[in-house]
Amino acid sequence: MTNVSTAFLVFSVLLIGGEMGNSVVAIGLTGGIAAGKSTVSKIFQEAGVIIVDADVIARKVVDPGKPAYRRIISAFGEDILIERDKTIDRAKLGALIFNDIKKRKTLNACTHKYIIYEMFKRLVLLKLIYRHQMVIFDAPLLFETHFMELFCYPIIVVSCPKAIAIDRMKKRNQLGEHQAEQRICAQMSLELKKQKAHFVIENSGSIDELTEQVNHIVSALRKIP
């Protein structure tokens, strides 16, 4: 990714805002770990909102041969590769960086600019070519990636009580309570995310209650000129 291509992309995103007045450039969707963001994202999709998923893009930018892949191998060595196909073993890499802030920052430095570039490239296509009014950036690290936050309005945060999040992680990830607690503590405070949000979705009830909250937000977003 060259500086020229990055500059062109930023110019295109700014052009979107100029062409469409005060309309939304990208709606931000983030939340706490195990808060149910993926479920909320699916409900938004069912309501006709286009989703650009950072996790999906993050997996693609580290395919063998890609620049981010080469940078990760250079930083962490070939021990993190799956022998069969030379793809990155996400579980092994995750375990390596989990309790090491310096290594997490190193990984982010290897991947974030490629993820952001691909997300904004899709935004330009969806807004300028296909003329979609509402496009959501579904990004777990939206606030931590400050550049992305600048181009998101409004921002939606999915929240749930800590006890529910821990229970979900124990079932979904086969983690012990202490491990689940560690993963929560390793992330930005959910309370801080909620303070920075324009909408908060509380995911502690039924799927019907969750859907009702999403539909209410979709109705509000459609009223934005």
Regions found by a protein language model. Name each.
Residues 56-133:
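ATP-dependent small-molecule kinase phosphotransfer cores
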Residues 5-24:
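Extreme N-terminal, non-catalytic leader segments
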Residues 47, 69-73, 162-170, 177, ...:
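An amphipathic alpha-helix signature
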Residues 148-149, 171-220:
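Small-molecule kinase domains that catalyze NTP-dependent phosphoryl transfer to phosphate-bearing small molecules
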Residues 40-41, 52-63, 78, 171, ...:
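N-terminal polybasic phosphate/anion-binding patch
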